Amino acid sequence: VGYVPVRGDCLEGTVNFVSNEVRELPADGRDRLDALFRSDPLMSRLDAELLSWSPGLATVRAKIQAAHTNFIGGGHGGIVFSLGDIAMSFASNGYGRQALATQIDISYHRGVLPGDLVIATASEISRTRRFGHHRVEMKVNERLVASATGTTYRTDEWHFGAEFWPDDWRGKY
């Protein structure tokens, strides 16, 4: 809660601030991004659900199914990783600027089983003009099963085109 100052882009020498407060997206940006996120093919393939999102924050969930298990019968770590990656992609793209994961480090703390409902929450730690850094937690029944940190590259491209987003929004985010 509150603001965390981060060093700005080296080329611009600016300072950006990351807030945990909900940001109001311009015009119908929220509805269009929501539809875009909900159309994610991998999320659909995993029968995952987007629970909530705002710029810099997102939560998704999925029940571990028999098809999500590894050869010893436990939930496959790749499914848990994918849920975290999906949450991070929505959090980082929630400003409207296209962002791509460049790195994710994950630690598995306990296994998951078929029937477990995994909830993955990604939150922004810091953001500059070019990079976003995120923390991701995957939980079952409020117990941490995996945690990750990741970096995203923030491109110059905007979802729905730059002209869709007001100048002040593009300048700030």
Predicted region positions:
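Terminal targeting signals and extreme-terminal segments of soluble enzymes
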Residues: 2-173
